[in-house]
Every structure is written in structure tokens, then in C-alpha cells.
Amino acid sequence: MNMFFRLTALAGLLAIAGQTFAVEDITRADQIPVLKEETQHATVSERVTSRFTRSHYRQFDLDQAFSAKIFDRYLNLLDYSHNVLLASDVEQFAKKKTELGDELRSGKLDVFYDLYNLAQKRRFERYQYALSVLEKPMDFTGNDTYNLDRSKAPWPKNEAELNALWDSKVKFDELSLKLTGKTDKEIRETLTRRYKFAIRRLAQTNSEDVFSLAMTAFAREIDPHTNYLSPRNTEQFNTEMSLSLEGIGAVLQMDDDYTVINSMVAGGPAAKSKAISVGDKIVGVGQTGKPMVDVIGWRLDDVVALIKGPKGSKVRLEILPAGKGTKTRTVTLTRERIRLEDRAVKMSVKTVGKEKVGVLDIPGFYVGLTDDVKVQLQKLEKQNVSSVIIDLRSNGGGALTEAVSLSGLFIPAGPIVQVRDNNGKVREDSDTDGQVFYKGPLVVLVDRFSASASEIFAAAMQDYGRALVVGEPTFGKGTVQQYRSLNRIYDQMLRPEWPALGSVQYTIQKFYRVNGGSTQRKGVTPDIIMPTGNEETETGEKFEDNALPWDSIDAATYVKSGDLTAFEPELLKEHNARIAKDPEFQNIMKDIARFNAMKDKRNIVSLNYAVREKENNEDDATRLARLNERFKREGKPELKKLDDLPKDYQEPDPYLDETVNIALDLAKLEKARPAEQPAPVK
């Protein structure tokens, strides 16, 4: 679900259809619950600890030194910006930092819960202070600055230092709204709602939130890709992997205290009803034979849990239509199995002159991906495309089996990836069918967010000489995770009152290319590297403080299905000539230069209105000029101001456009080359 918060002017009290909906403000610290472990958490902690210490690839001792590291990670997860807790708070609990291993083994998580409860109290105090700051006159004429990233800053020594940090935070929030054109009155109203909303959320925190954070600190200290998944996150994970769920087919978001329809899945129950529209608010949820439950002010995940249910069952929604002065209405929907098509492979065809290039955009390696790609390749074959692009940008991976089977569509047979466990045992995962589903020119487009299964596929295509890889160096995740439920068959017999216990993902293996190299930390280096607008940002495995190291093993025995190295000089020459003249890439290069010039200052922003307005005006002027240059090239009328830009305007994708050109060049070169006999590689 999409759980971001939009700030709009909504009345805190609405009289609707004869009912009064109100959400109580939290004005005292004692209204925030003191959170304690639930009965099942001790057992879950014991099972998680046992699983990680016995089975994780990185063999570690849960000793005092490791416990101290868990404490530090938990502390930073709890107060990332170091602007909630005091240094004395940290020192108070640091005395017990070496005891966390014992707590995890026993399941008695006192330090985790006590520290969380203190942070809740401190966070309440901070937002109460922020509300008091709003009453002061606003002054944006000084030389104050605001640090956007305090993750490495020391914790404040006293309340005066803490107040100074929040003076700057409130001033930053005020100035951000003032730059949008809001009046001082509107700014105060908006921020008052925002801060009170944050306080109400404190009162909705539950024991599972604390437990999840504790387990996350433990898991992430072992390596970046080891996770504890709460029962609800486990359900979400299964949905992502299968691309299906049972529900009403709507994406929800929070808007102050309201659950709002953000979008609807075409063909789903919500869309088919024609009684629900984007922007409508869900104020009540009712199950068959049960009264309607008022959900105003509820956590989004709690509302979602009420709405979802088995296929064929009914759910009643009390809907407040978008707009003012409207009455609620009740809509009854029958839940269905919903396929999340927006996460499935998408096919498109790019036409350049008389040539066509097929593009397969793959957002993730879900179960069933290979079968879906086969269908799309058949469609592309009917359109007589000259080449195919596999777009793996922002693809974070997924099922290892799908990476292997997808690779098998493009080579006759052979190993795709080598997998090694922590005992040194190496396994080859291979394609064995001896068939090639697509034999034409192939290009793989990647970026720094292409990870894991994406890197397995890209590396295999590169090592076999089957495809040209273009884009950015990839993320560098070269590890394999295993997913295990924490439930036991006997749990429901012995403890029927327990909910589901969640699951864990933990690293059990590292994978290696067929050439023996690892993608861990280094990723896959493209044959043609594209310039990007955010050069050297801290994205990738190598920036994780506890990532497993890079290493290599012996190469597998495999038969290359092609060799594109002879083409690379010509392809690179044509590519460089094009982007040197391409206005979009010229702008990208300017952005790179600007980013690099400002990278040491990018987290420090001015709190002076004139300075920020000048910066914003310059940015707007640059964007408007670039848009008008583009429109002029396209023969479209120029814009007078940015507000005239249509809301549905689609920005061009210069990286994909250039990849299409590279694919056409590759197709021409391959067509002109005589067939060669492949040779085995050892």
C-alpha cells in the first residue's frame, strides 16, 4: 500500500449524514500507551535468534561486542536524526548495551521496550514544543541554516540544544510552506494539523511496532538483507511475489486522519462498482452481519486489514465522496483475487524510421515472470522487431529461479549462476532445455537500483556474449536470502490465541557469475556506461557498513552464445557522438557538474526567504527554459509559466531513447556479421 501523507486543509470535525466524526487530540504524555511485549513475542524472539545464529551465511557470535552494535543500530533506527533523545538518555541505556544478546535469546526484551517508550515520551514533548514555536512571529531574514541529515551528529546535551534543533525544524517547515505561497495563517493551520496528527500517531503505536524495530536492528546488524517480517509485512511480501491479493482492488493512502482512495486496479471490485472514485474517503468498514466500524483516525495498515478478505466474501464501505458538503453512502463490494498488473512485465514498441525495437519493462522477478515474458516475446515477434531491450532499471530483484529461467529464454543451455554456501559448497543453477525462445539482438538496460536477480540476469547475458549491457553500474547485491515462516504446526493447538508469528529472510549463500566473479559490492559494469544526473550518490551495496565482502571462485564451464566485444568500439563511438549532440544529455551533464559542485553542501539549506526564493526561481527558470527548448524541437507552443504545464505531461526518457538507438546499431552490426561457431569457456 502507498502510505505517504498528503497535507490538505480538512476540518478536524465533520458533521456527516447525521453523525459527528471526531478524532481526539492527545494533550498529555500519559495518553500515549506504555508498550509491553505481547505473549507471543518471547517465542518469536527465541526462534529468530536461533535461526540467525545457526543458519546465517555470516557466522557470528551474539556476544557483548555484537550486542553493543545491535544497540547502536536500534538507537539510530529509533532516532535517525538525533533530534529526539538527549545524550543523557542514550548514556542511561548504553550501560545495558552488552545485555541485548541475552535479551534476544531469552525473549525478554526490556531494554528495547523501555528505550522505545522513552523515545515516545520525548517525541511527544518535541511536537508539543513545535506547536508552541508556531505561536511565535516568523522571521526569515537571518542567516540561519537547517541540516537535513543529522544521522552522524551527536545527540543534544540538554533541552536547550534540543529546542534549538526544533526551532530550526519548525522554521524549515514554515519556510517550505511560505515558498508555496501560503499566508502565515495558512502555514500555522497546516503545521498545527501536521504536528497534532504526528502526536495522534504516537498513541496508535503498538507492541508489534517495537518488536519489529528490535528484530530489524538485530537482523540488519548481521547484514543489510536480513530481515524480520511482521505478520502484516509477511502478507505484503507474499502479495509482491505472487502479484496477487484478495481484496477490493484499491490503493489507499492517508490524508490527515482519513483513509483515501489513491487509485483503483482496472477490473477490480472497487472500479467495477462505479460507486467509488479516486479521492473518496473511507470512514467506515463493515463485515457481513456485523456493525459498521468507524475508521477515522485509524492507522492505514489497520484499515487495510479490515478491508482485505477471502475471495467471494463481502465488505461494506462507508464512503465520504470527494468534495465539500457531501453525505456518506454505503457501498457493498464482493472481494476478488486481484492481479497487480502494474508490477508485471510491460511490453512496448519503439519505432525509429522503418525499424521497430521491442521493450520489455520488468519491475521485479516475481513468480511467473518467465511465462509472462514468453507471451510478450511472441507478440513482439509478430511485430517484426529488429531487436529487444530488457529494461531492468529500478528492479530490486526477486525470485532466483525466475532469473535462471528468464536467462534460459535467450541461450540454448548452460549454467546461469553459481551459488556458494558458507561451507564453501558450490552449486550451479542452469538452463537445461536446449531451446532458445528469442535469438535476435538483445540489449539489457540497468541502473544503480538494479539488484540481485537483475544482476544475475544481466551478468549471465554479458558473460555469454548474448546481450549488450548498457546504463549504470548496478547495485552490487550478490547474496541469496532464504524465506522462512516463524509459525509452527503446533502453535495453533497449544496457543490458539496467538496471531500469525511473521517470518524471516536471511542470507544463506553468495552468488557468482559463470565467469567466477561476484557481483557483491561491485555490481555489473555495463558495456556502455551512460552519464547520470546524480553522480556518486551513496546508493549501492558498497555503501552499507556491514555488507559481505567481494570475492571470486573458479569459473564454470559454459559455451558462449556470442561475442559482442568486436562491436563495442563502434557502438561506443556512435553512442558518444549522439549524446554529445543530444540536448537532453547535455542538460544531464550540466546537472552532473552542478551536483558535484554542490555535493558537500547539499544537506545544508538556508532559512532565509530571499535566498531560498532566489534558488527556487533559478530552478524554475531553468526548468521552464528546458521545457520550452524541448517543445520548440517538437513543434509545440511554448509555455509562459510552469503552471501551464499539463498535469499529465510525460517527461521524455533519454536513457531508454538512447538505448533504442544502441539496439538499432547492434542489430545492423549483427546482421552484417557472418555466423560464428561458439566455443566453450573454462
Curated annotation (Swiss-Prot):
Catalytic center residues: 452, 463, 477
Spans annotated as Disordered: 635-654
Membrane topology classification: Peripheral membrane protein
Subcellular location(s) per record: Cell inner membrane
MF GO annotations: endopeptidase activity; serine-type endopeptidase activity
Resulting phenotype, residue 463 to A: Loss of activity
Entry's Gene Ontology BP terms: protein catabolic process; proteolysis; response to antibiotic; signal transduction; symbiont-mediated evasion of recognition by host complement
Keyword Cell inner membrane: yes
Catalysed reaction equations from the record: The enzyme shows specific recognition of a C-terminal tripeptide, Xaa-Yaa-Zaa, in which Xaa is preferably Ala or Leu, Yaa is preferably Ala or Tyr, and Zaa is preferably Ala, but then cleaves at a variable distance from the C-terminus. A typical cleavage is -Ala-Ala-|-Arg-Ala-Ala-Lys-Glu-Asn-Tyr-Ala-Leu-Ala-Ala
Basic and acidic residues bias: start-end ranges: 635-650
Signal peptide residue numbers: 1-22
CDD domains: cpPDZ_CPP-like, Peptidase_S41_CPP
SUPFAM superfamilies: ClpP/crotonase (SSF52096), PDZ domain-like (SSF50156)
Effect the entry attributes to changing residue 398 to A: Loss of activity. Perturbs protein structure
Family per similarity comment: Belongs to the peptidase S41A family.
Protein name per UniProt: Tail-specific protease
Annotated source species: Escherichia coli (strain K12)
Lineage: Bacteria, Pseudomonadati, Pseudomonadota, Gammaproteobacteria, Enterobacterales
